[in-house]
């Protein structure tokens, strides 16, 4: 019986410790990654504007080639919604085009449903460096409420890594 009480006390102590840490952990994140693509700005922007193309380079989307996709609206314009349902790594959610500044940026809202509920925001911006060179900046931001914000200590690095891989895949596709 004493062993059970000791185990419960240790477990309770760990939980209390994590809850205290979460009090002092930031509630949101904003991650930015960029890459230079050897292709004209218009070619890059036209490709990015079509959310259906994101399956070709997005690290998360490529993790489950058999996921189910649904589309609502016209791709490449504000209001288009791309929804997916896949394995545990991909989960379930939808992405909606919220704003487009032609030749400059595409803003989307991502609404995750499974394995957890979360709303995030993504911005893809393009900048012409020369006639045949474009800088692409990918930004991702969201917030987590207490006590789930403690997860930010672990996931921020992983999100940044996935973003870098996605941009490298995008570069490979557009430089062919």
Q: Which positions does each model-derived feature cover?
A:
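Extracytoplasmic/secreted envelope proteins and their assembly/folding machinery
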Residues: 41, 48-54, 94, 123, ...
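Solvent-exposed, acidic/flexible segments
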Residues: 37, 47, 90, 156, ...
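Hydrophobic ligand-binding cavity/cleft-lining segments
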Residues: 2-74
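Beta-strand/loop substructures that line and gate deep hydrophobic ligand-binding cavities in soluble
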Residues: 107-165, 170-172
């Amino acid at each position: 019986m004493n062993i059970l009480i000791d185990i419960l006390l240790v477990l309770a102590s760990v939980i209390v410790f994590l809850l205290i840490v979460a009090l002092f952990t930031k509630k949101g994140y904003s991650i930015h990654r960029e890459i230079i693509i050897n292709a004209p700005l218009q070619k890059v922007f036209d490709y990015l504007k079509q959310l259906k193309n994101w399956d070709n380079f997005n690290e998360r989307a490529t993790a489950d080639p058999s996921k189910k996709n649904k589309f609502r609206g016209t791709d490449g314009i504000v209001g288009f919604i791309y929804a997916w349902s896949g394995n545990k790594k991909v989960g379930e959610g939808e992405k909606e085009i919220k704003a487009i500044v032609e030749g400059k940026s595409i803003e989307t809202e991502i609404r995750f449903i499974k394995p957890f509920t979360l709303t995030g925001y993504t911005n893809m911006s393009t900048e012409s460096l020369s006639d045949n060179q474009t800088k692409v900046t990918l930004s991702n931001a969201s917030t987590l409420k207490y006590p789930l914000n403690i997860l930010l200590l672990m996931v921020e690095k992983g999100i940044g890594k996935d973003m870098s891989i996605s941009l490298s895949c995008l570069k490979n596709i557009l430089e062919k």
